[in-house]
């Protein structure tokens, strides 16, 4: 067992051979590597599976032995400075390792089929494997320098994957936006790390905790400077986990392939910020102002993410704002000191959100056969509807993920979210009211997504929903280059509703985009499973292939049962705290709260749970009332669906609803504010500086030059070499 811990430093580097071999193969043997490209799914999954097995073994040892292991190598540069690097295995590391590997394996398995048609298949798997390597290195780091190195690698991989289809202008803009926004947080993180080193002289977590505790206890540290360092450290987590006000990159990150969205939102990039705050919580907890600030940012993000998700029409953007809101719950829990609740929600949310994103990928995959490779069509919920008849397995999986995120028992997110809500009442009643209200909003917007996607009629030819007569279609196989074919516009909705099934089928089949030699229907996936029966048709959306469905089914099982790890099994006060998660987190909980009592009053738990579940069902009821097909008007798919027109003068309630809808659909006008105040402000400042440089600075120097030139030209004629002219000038002056 000792050898397992000692050599666990190799864990982050196990997936690394895949991107290295792909790169070498493309350089030395490009033709053979491209011809055998489908084989790279197997080594990617196999190597990550080895990491998963090691992670499970380490977690079992953590549960049984309850200790923290750290192995450090010292690199002495001179007598005054030595850099120590190594790896740290503790409960937080074990949880993150299992989370990254399990979600990563399922996403890779899913991606083999999802990306089979894409010319960038090899590039995709190289990026994905390096992404996993970077995240594994981040969670096993034993000091702040290592964390910063892998932190930057995670950001680089996310930049590459968000802009995977880089010839698509929106994708290129999105990856730049994510990169620049995260640079703000990363710069703050770097300054915070350097500030802590200036105070303590160490980057190691164990030294930081001990030295800072002693310095603060003896009042030997400048309090304001230390608080500033903590704020800067937290800024890195704010940007990476898409917390307000650095959240603007997250919805635009949906321009990348859907499997990337699943991995980023479940177990890698956005989880990195939560991991950093959890890792540094022993530092933050010393200063109450920092904890209050963390909880404040968390509760603002909870509410903002939920309100911005209310009116999104893009299915992936709606899920992105959902992720933002749920990350706010985790940050709120950390700010309240609820370490266990935050990590519990990180676990349950990861599997539920991965399921939802892979489900949305299956929906998009099926819609592309009808509307072509156009994100503004294949991801638009207004063009969906009635898909439960065509993609029943995807519908069931998506419903399970939706119910879990809504907090419906006994699904995974119910247990963790309810624990956060209970702790919030003890921390601040105002925060608790906001958190509980947001739980109702979560149920509303999640069921809105479900109802618009799976219930009602298939609205693929319902055009002009946003006032646009046409939109561009893109070919993923060409990395975003526009294709010449377009879907017929100005199609009447009434004819769609009145035509019979045969007419509908023939109409859709005539407008189907056929896929070329690289198409999905002509390439068999490297991994084939025959457990499910799917019906392929191009008249209506069809169920995804079995490889994609397999990953979704496994995530359904996780969503159903992963909540068990945090549920107390015994009902007496002596053993009530001996659930699996508490056993695993026992060393960390004792470090943060030496006299903590994890006992649970089941009567109080049931009472609070009944309240939160009632709020969730109320949100579901409102969503059903507004978006259920029997009440909905297909001509106005927004918050005004169920309200009849009352003449030209709308009442105040209509204006309020319109205002809420506009606020949500336009992202709270935060992006517009940043564009005006920052982007245009910086450009205006640059133009002003350019004007001053060209006109003022250059004008002064050029003016001196011109003055000297004309002065020289003037006196040149005076000194022409004639003595008579010199005498005349002399006598005229004197």
Swiss-Prot record:
One of its GO terms (molecular function) is NADH dehydrogenase (ubiquinone) activity. It is a multi-pass membrane protein. Keywords: Chloroplast, Membrane, NAD, NADP, Plastid, Plastoquinone, Quinone, Thylakoid, Translocase, Transmembrane, Transmembrane helix, Transport. It is found in: Plastid, Chloroplast thylakoid membrane. It comes from the Eukaryota. It is an enzyme of class 7 (translocase). One of its GO terms (biological process) is electron transport coupled proton transport. GO terms for cellular component: chloroplast thylakoid membrane. It catalyses: a plastoquinone + NADH + (n+1) H(+)(in) = a plastoquinol + NAD(+) + n H(+)(out); a plastoquinone + NADPH + (n+1) H(+)(in) = a plastoquinol + NADP(+) + n H(+)(out). The keyword Disulfide bond does not apply. Its EC number is 7.1.1.-. The chain crosses the membrane at residues 9-29, 40-60, 89-109, 125-145, 147-167, 185-205, 219-239, 258-278, 280-300, 327-347, 354-374, 396-416, 425-445, 549-569, 605-625. Belongs to the complex I subunit 5 family. NDH shuttles electrons from NAD(P)H:plastoquinone, via FMN and iron-sulfur (Fe-S) centers, to quinones in the photosynthetic chain and possibly in a chloroplast respiratory chain. The immediate electron acceptor for the enzyme in this species is believed to be plastoquinone. Couples the redox reaction to proton translocation, and thus conserves the redox energy in a proton gradient. NCBIfam families: NDH_I_L, PRK06590.1. PANTHER family: NADH-UBIQUINONE OXIDOREDUCTASE CHAIN 5. NDH is composed of at least 16 different subunits, 5 of which are encoded in the nucleus. This is NAD(P)H-quinone oxidoreductase subunit 5, chloroplastic.
